[in-house]
Amino acid sequence: MKQHLWPLFLEAVKRDVVPALGCTEPISVALAAAIAIDELGIKNQASNVKLDVKIDVAVSANLMKNGMGVGIPGTGMVGLPIAAAIGAIAGDRHAGLEVLKSIKDSDVQAAKLMLANELVTVGVADVANILYAKVTVYYQQQTASVTIADSHTKVIAIEKNGEQCLLESQAKTTNDNSCKANPFTEAKLQDIYDFAMQAPLDDIRFIMQAKTLNDALSIEGLSGNYGLKIGATLVKNQAKGLLSGGLLTEVLARTAGASDARMDGAMMPAMSNSGSGNQGIAATMPVVACAEFLKSSETQTIRALMLSHLTAIYIKSYQNKLSALCGATTASMGAAAGITYLLDGELEQISAAICSMIGDVSGIICDGAKASCAMKVSSSAGSAVKSALMAIDGIRVTGTEGIVADDVDQTICNLATLANGAMTQTDVQILEIMLHK
């Protein structure tokens, strides 16, 4: 047992499972804009000088893809231009992924006026970074630019009036912790399982915050008018008798409801995973719904949620930060692990469930963040339940089928090889289609 990894596992979860208000790609643009205008010293008067401010945004292709069609919290609009404008006018540079938590209606109106006067431009930067956003703010004779790269809150450069205020070599001094030691270069799923099952309960109880935040988002999504209303549609048709109740329907509806609200800009934070609110929802809500359906104890729920989130982080650690592979699918593999545990499965069954999921949903593409992501989230949640139930019955996708190997860790590596290799060209094709349709 590799107990020396346990403190690193805790660090990884506390780093990667954090509250986030709004889709994290446009939020990184809003954060950069908030920092840039703050550097110019006009933050408190930004809404009054809005027509004297111009903003230029340059982002990586992947960030453009994920920012084009997703709702920005509190604005009723989608896309990177409104994210940059509202971030500059009312963003809190110290709030990280919750940069927009304090915006008011008057701020939104000011941001919309900036867009109407064509004061915000957005383009694709020719950079190697998969996650990259540079925001430059112009005010009178002053300029300030802020660059975020590689992680959603990692500021690597700040420049004011042509002078560097922060260089990439100093980036470790920001509030981003992405440079921490990576325990997953040594870890296997066995180690993740051992930690989730045996770590002192008080050390991992904090993971219940994921349940609190994402369940509240689910309730909001099921009761409000958000996105494609996938969760609400499932609940409505269950009441009509067109769908039966039970574990699967409960998991699908509650998970989709949270994603509906998230992707349509609800002013409520999600507990994220690996820099994504949807991935946090996918790793949380299927486990929560299953635990409540099975009447699992609080201890079981805590361990299931920790197993789910840490497994999701482990699988994602092999992949690029952003890719053409839908992140909700990999996060839901964590949920499959958590559900299998709640159904009294052990490591063998958990491994089987993950392998079956990779055999099922590994081809789902990411074509940007948007309302329909809730469909992919619910589909992946359904696969998690299906794979868990199969595993409990001793059934799994075998090592003779497709990219699935007999060994779960090798199968996870195979999935990453696909995502980081051939699917990079898929990503290029997806963005080309999106920009020219």
Curated annotation (Swiss-Prot):
Signal peptide: none annotated. It comes from the Bacteria. This is UPF0597 protein Shal_0864. One of its GO terms (molecular function) is L-cysteine desulfhydrase activity. Disulfide bonds: none annotated. HAMAP family: UPF0597. It comes from Shewanella halifaxensis (strain HAW-EB4). Pfam families: SDH_alpha. Belongs to the UPF0597 family. InterPro entries: Ser_deHydtase-like_asu (IPR005130), UPF0597 (IPR021144). PANTHER family: UPF0597 PROTEIN YHAM.
